[in-house]
Amino acid sequence: MLKLQMVLMSLLLLPLIVNLYPWIIALTLSALLLPTCFNLVNSASYSMFTEYMSSDMMSFTLSALTIWVTVMMILASTKIMHLNMYPKMFMTNLVILLIILINCFLSPNLIMFYIWFEASLIPTMVLIMTWGYQPERSQASMYLMIYTVAASLPMLMVLCKIFIVSKTAMMPMFMNMEFPMDYPSMALAWVLTLGGFLVKLPMFTVHLWLPKAHVEAPIAGSMILAAILLKLGGYGILRMLSLFHYMAKSTSSLLSSVALVGAVSTSLICLRQSDLKSLIAYSSVGHMGLMVAGALMSSNWGFQAALAMMIAHGLSSSALFVMANMNYELTHTRSLFLMKGLLVLAPTLTMWWFLFTASNMAAPPSINLLSEIMLITSILKMSTSAFILLGLTSFFTAAYCLYMYTSMHHGPLMLTSNPIPQFKVKDLTLMTMHLVPTILIIFKPELITSWS
């Protein structure tokens, strides 16, 4: 099975050298790789294949999500092929980004993980700069690069220090290891390491790059940003908690408070957004704040809840960005003040908006509800005083979801809207691919909650 996976990963490079039908090749091979990923998930709880590749439930769950989202990105970006907007270059970029992300999730080596973690920045910037919408995309790329690099360089220094002190860079070796470092040094190392991941997440106060990047990115860029790239930060935090578990317990109250206050603040910011993509981007900050608060509780229940939230948010936020792109093609605007009457113009699209808006606000039977219940209980177990912030977060999340839905679908129809809505089979397939795992995983939740 491992050999089959390696062969298929190598075959994914074919679109780089084949001139004909690059979309079909990448789509087919990505679909073939997905069942391989699930078969490996059902193997041992932790398996180390080589010095540079290992797996457990979290890494393979996120790898499967990466492949699934990549397939949907290709389906959502067929306009690039039809308009001949450098389709081969686009496919090459997507395949490179896919390989980087899978290597990042499967790497047990701390230094290699950092290299793949940073390498994901390059294809993302190429996506925004080459296929972005507005001239401001250069500013968005600059924000993304400066925030990520500025936070990651101190983290690299800490990782090198860990390697020198422990004489190993293998993350599984950190589980029961005692480091000969005093408390202030460990505290500084934890803060610098956490900073690099919190910017990628991003957490409130270091989130300004995210709305800019989402607004200027093409549909494929928004999907991969929301569904996968933000999860690199959460994945890194969960991995490093095995090394800094004592420091995490001593700082969890402060950091969780900041994360929950940020979740409430970004939910309030969502209520006054007029740009649809910006609203969805800010909602991601709120959900990731709740996720990091649960992860920092350092309990098995919190770890499982954080992973469940990453999977649930990856599917729902990707779907919201796909539908935002469909709305833009119908109305030629992203403004919630101008985007009115879609219930009359596109009732099928309205149905999909209702389903995924409900999923985003954690309504049953979505896995978002499961993840939020698990996160709230894990946080309240450690600190009952957090129930006020958790209640406000849940309330304002529902409020901005209803505001987003009613602003677009009710009211008089815009005169500038496309009179013949084009809801194609491709769009129906895309939305179904988002909805099916969101609903079905609730019947087998151990797929996303059995890691600890």
Curated annotation (Swiss-Prot):
One of its GO terms (cellular component) is mitochondrial membrane. It comes from Lumbricus terrestris (Common earthworm). Belongs to the complex I subunit 4 family. The chain crosses the membrane at residues 7-27, 57-77, 95-115, 116-136, 145-165, 186-206, 218-238, 251-271, 278-298, 303-323, 336-356, 360-380, 386-406, 428-448. It is found in: Mitochondrion membrane. InterPro entries: NADH4_N, NADH_UbQ_OxRdtase, ND/Mrp_TM. Its main location: mitochondrion. The lineage of its organism: Eukaryota, Metazoa, Spiralia, Lophotrochozoa, Annelida. The gene is ND4. Its EC number is 7.1.1.2. The keyword Nucleus does not apply. It is a multi-pass membrane protein. It catalyses: a ubiquinone + NADH + 5 H(+)(in) = a ubiquinol + NAD(+) + 4 H(+)(out). This is NADH-ubiquinone oxidoreductase chain 4.
